[in-house]
Amino acid sequence: MNTIEGKLTLTGKEKIAIINARFNHIITDRLVEGAKDAFMRHGGDEKNLSLILVPGAYEIPFALDLAIKSSKFDAICCVGAIIRGSTPHFDYVAAETAKGIAQTTLKYGIPVSFGVLTTENIEQAIERAGSKAGNKGFEAMSSVIEMLNLYKNLKA
């Protein structure tokens, strides 16, 4: 059987954007640092890494659509933190953000990763932004690098 997969390496020429939702910035700043760390560790050139800031997670799909249409990026890593409160707002924002990112990814067919935390409380978010559960920003960037290389392999 022939196995096709993407490697977890960059040549230094790939242009990748991180779209970061500023809301809950104490968490999302750590996700961005994790994503940047993964980009650099896997061979990225910092001049080819861009940070796109949006107010909150709900705005990520729109910024993603604009970033892809700009043709400036080979892949995009989306990060944010949606933390449940006492109203149903969490459910709507989490669902629409996930759906919007997925639809935009499929619409344009370029590698995009989903590093948006959806947690029950701030403690869970902190755990996933660099403490007990690792850094989901690092994981999201690693995923998009692997998918970018898979995309190149399958497109060739």
UniProtKB/Swiss-Prot annotation:
Extract the coiled-coil ranges from the record.
none
| Keywords, alphabetical | Riboflavin biosynthesis, Transferase
* Reactions catalysed, as given in the entry: (2S)-2-hydroxy-3-oxobutyl phosphate + 5-amino-6-(D-ribitylamino)uracil = 6,7-dimethyl-8-(1-D-ribityl)lumazine + phosphate + 2 H2O + H(+)
The EC number(s) given in the record are 2.5.1.78
The record's listing under SUPFAM superfamilies reads: Lumazine synthase
- Pathway field: Cofactor biosynthesis; riboflavin biosynthesis; riboflavin from 2-hydroxy-3-oxobutyl phosphate and 5-amino-6-(D-ribitylamino)uracil: step 1/2
Q: Name one GO biological process term.
A: riboflavin biosynthetic process
Binding positions for 5-amino-6-(D-ribitylamino)uracil?
23, 57-59, 81-83, 114
Q: Quote the protein name from its UniProt record.
A: 6,7-dimethyl-8-ribityllumazine synthase
Record organism: Campylobacter hominis (strain ATCC BAA-381 / DSM 21671 / CCUG 45161 / LMG 19568 / NCTC 13146 / CH001A)
Q: What gene, per UniProt, encodes this protein?
A: ribH
